[in-house]
Amino acid sequence: MKSVLYSYILFLSCIIINGRDVTPYAPSNGKCKDNEYKRHNLCCLSCPPGTYASRLCDSKTNTQCTPCGSGTFTSRNNHLPACLSCNGRCDSNQVETRSCNTTHNRICECSPGYYCILKGSSGCKACVSQTKCGIGYGVSGHTSAGDVICSPCGLGTYSRTVSSADKCEPVPSNTFNYIDVEINLYPVNDTSCTRTTTTGISESISTSELTITMNHKDCDPVFREEYFSVLNKVATSGFFTGENRYQNISKVCTLNFEIKCNNKGSSSKQLTKAKNDDGIMPHSETVTLVGDCLSSVDIYILYSNTNTQDYETDTISYHAGNVLDVDSHMPGSCDIHKLITNSKPTHFL
């Protein structure tokens, strides 16, 4: 209905233009008015936006204007022989910011996550995906073309998304982004072992003597490496995560350890915490020993917020037996011992 009414108004305007008691005239100063054009040294009326000149003026008759048809337009006063065609429909990675009508061309701009590589007189002609900043990086700005600039998150900030829009966020309080587990066992005679397998919910280290299994639930930091080293019948092993994911404080990261002797006994007992420096970080642990092959066991679990000035930590430890020192550390030069890892593991300071 609106388009019909608009066409009718344009039609009337054309009648008014052509019906005015104005005939082409010779300008006294050689110049025509803004809404006129010059033809054969005569000033003639231009057609208004939304119309075109179906017939140009002559010495006795002014310009005849006709409304633009569907899919065509003129956006200014003109004496064009036909209306201009509107741009085609926007691509899938674009949004239409202005539709085609008889007075305006269609305008397409890039959708969120894209930027323009080919601009036209009416919007963007071609868009491509913006760079996505990886975990640990955030959007810090944009190039002159509109692509994303990624910068590492600084101290006190973090990013756990792959995104072309997210900036680095302030580090959340009372949580952690790193878990380091150290397990000391005595006596251990067999230095042979196999690479740890990852199933998504558990990690395990197996030798001919024993099997260490850690089941984890609702833990956002991702366990990525593990190690096993034997020196003077003391095995030092453990698991640790990357530092690019923070624990969601609405969940409790739960670690359940089972240290099982493969050939000596089947009795089971659960250890109690020997040291409890845990604060309000969201975590929970259990440790179960199965069998009689070990006389001493130490377990240290460190939950850390490594991206703060004060390096916030919670430390949990378990101890059984009287041979191992509760403050013992992993050997500082583990690469000379039997080791399962892709790189030298970290250890407590």
UniProtKB/Swiss-Prot annotation:
It is found in: Secreted. Disulfide bonds join C32-C43, C44-C57, C47-C65, C68-C83, C86-C100, C90-C108. GO terms for cellular component: extracellular region. Its main location: secreted. The keyword Translocase does not apply. Residues 1-19 form the signal peptide. Keywords: Disulfide bond, Glycoprotein, Receptor, Repeat, Secreted, Signal. GO terms for biological process: positive regulation of membrane protein ectodomain proteolysis; regulation of T cell proliferation; symbiont-mediated perturbation of host defense response. The keyword Glycoprotein applies. Glycans are attached at N101, N189, N248. Induction: Expressed in the early phase of the viral replicative cycle. GO terms for molecular function: tumor necrosis factor binding; tumor necrosis factor receptor activity. InterPro entries: Poxvirus_TNF-rcpt-II_C, Poxvirus_TNF_rcpt-II, TNF_chemokine_rcpt-like, TNFR/NGFR_Cys_rich_reg, TNFRSF_N_viral. TNFR-Cys repeats lie at residues 31-65, 67-108. Belongs to the orthopoxvirus OPG002 family. Inhibits host immune defense by binding to host TNF and various chemokines in the extracellular space. Binds host CC chemokines (beta chemokines) and CXC chemokines (alpha chemokines). This is Soluble TNF receptor II. The gene is OPG002.
